[in-house]
Amino acid sequence: LNYLYLIWEDKYSNKAYSGLNEGFTTINTGAITDSEESKLIWYENDQLFDDFYASVYDNLTQLAGRYPQEVSLIVHHWNKTAKNDSMEILDCGCGTGIATVFFARQGVKSIIGLDISNAMLRRARNVTLVAAKLPTEQKESVRFLEGDMNMESTFAAGQFSHAALLFFTIYYSNDPSGLFKNLFYWIRPGGQIAVEVVNKYKFDPMLESASPFVGLSLQKYTKDRVTKSKVEFDKFSYEAEFDLSDPDAEFRETFRFPDKSIRRQRHTFTMRDIKDFIHLASAAGWKYDGYIDLITAGFEYAYVLIFTHP
């Protein structure tokens, strides 16, 4: 495996960029070229989830390979107190709707995928939901809604029986305490929430699309933690780097196109310790019920925290 890793590292450190520029617009200032201008711009959290990123997000993250198992584990845990056909679920920060669709496949009563990005939601409605080819009843149980999870007024009191915050959703919130309070307001008594977190010091920050081995983390076979991803796609070259300045973190992405234009974007997170999230949730009224280890879903050092509304 160490030998294969060295081959992979050499391949992706030296491979020439190739492909076509699609879904990327540079800004013409008149002072410098478009490609030069593009190198100076950074897309931040509130800007980067646009049509271009929505179109490539699933290929980059490849969450479709992990979510079926993760969703099944969550629903199995929820089954201890509720039946599938009684669940009214909120998928908070649903993105392109992959997890939303997998929840619907479980035969839940209804599910709303909430996201603040209109572009990601269009992708969810027009691509993910269509490609899923759900039976009519399951398809009709799905709704996607543009809204802010950090605003209590987004939903009514007790509107849902369950909620899920998957992938890095919790880390995008600048006010997790307020978010837990909102969820406590939206979920009726007896309901539950599932919140995905990671061990920020040990989880694998490499994107699945950048790994040379499907379902296998390179972290076990390298002396130093691998924090960079590099992938060659047909239409652009992609690089990413995870940088932890505890408790803050950045995930920086760079897309390079054949016309020499560049798109740079920076995800900023507040990565509190797992015990801090449990404390914040408890302070908002939630009862901590334990966690699900996602190693069986192919994600080491990632966990789903389960909380119950008393």
Residue ranges and their predicted role:
Residues 194-279:
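SAM-dependent methyltransferase
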Residues 177-189:
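A short glycine-rich, Lys/Arg-flanked "PGG" loop and its adjoining helix->strand segment in the class I
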